[in-house]
Amino acid sequence: MGNVIRVQHLNYTYPEAKQQALTDVSFDVAKGEWLAIIGHNGSGKSTLAKNLNGLLAPESGTVQVAGMTLSEETVWDIRAKVGIVFQNPDNQFVGATVADDVAFGLENRGVPRPEMIKRVDEALDRVGMTAFADREPARLSGGQKQRVAIAGIVAQRPEIIILDESTSMLDPAGRQEVLGVIRELKDELGLTVLSITHDIDEAAEAHRIILLNDGKINEIGTPSEIFSHGMELLRLGLDVPYSEKLKDALAQRGIAMPKDYMDNERLVDYLWTLHSTM
């Protein structure tokens, strides 16, 4: 598959700042890929997300999305391709009801009403929120609010969804609820997903991970490759998945463990299989 995003030698400095927020950042994202971008607070993750759809303009370097180079002439076309779900959904809500809120972006784009109603219904159905169409967004749970925010993006039919710390304010159940929705949408619609996060378990969902540190790319690799550097992640203010900690502890006790990353469920299956052979 071809690349849907290409970033080359991207630099960005905030006005009045003494230090660059992003320094010589380069990477590609394949169509249909799930890419996680992790790093400590202030590492440049959200700045990078905002440079990808023109909320911020690169100081130098280039950003290409769906074959278009980001510029004043292309920014609105690129924003039609990229939807961002932010950390706090309350800051995105503008409609009196869930359905009104999902329709808001379509109204701004002049989508005819019959088509708008169809898209709103489809989007709410895809995220499992049809029964809440007439509810006030403020009365929903955190996970439900993020599902509505995702529906508002999906209704606009983007090619790329960026999750900018979208699960950081949710409890574990709400986090899994939202990630499950994104997983299904990615598979059903062929979406490309960029997950900006410091949550290691969320990053584990990705095909590849970019590790940012002080605005620079520290490493790019698969979850297995990134999580194998446990002490390095801890030094950078990040965590290591529980399953990786357990694998390391078992390996130190002389138990043969696979090198590939395993989530909790796969690790339990492996340990049961190992136990049955003893």
From Swiss-Prot:
Keywords: ATP-binding, Cell membrane, Membrane, Nucleotide-binding, Translocase, Transport. Its main location: membrane. One of its GO terms (cellular component) is ATP-binding cassette (ABC) transporter complex. It comes from the Bacteria. Disulfide bonds: none annotated. The keyword Repressor does not apply. The active site is at E165. Its EC number is 7.-.-.-. It is a peripheral membrane protein. ATP binds at G39, H40, N41, G42, S43, G44, K45, S46. Gene3D superfamilies: P-loop containing nucleotide triphosphate hydrolases. SUPFAM superfamilies: P-loop containing nucleoside triphosphate hydrolases. Residues 5-239 form the ABC transporter domain. The keyword Glycoprotein does not apply. It is found in: Cell membrane. Belongs to the ABC transporter superfamily. Energy-coupling factor EcfA family. NCBIfam families: ECF_ATPase_1, PRK13635.1, PRK13648.1. PANTHER family: ENERGY-COUPLING FACTOR TRANSPORTER ATP-BINDING PROTEIN ECFA1, HEAVY METAL TRANSPORTER. This is Energy-coupling factor transporter ATP-binding protein EcfA1. The lineage of its organism: Bacteria, Bacillati, Bacillota, Bacilli, Lactobacillales.
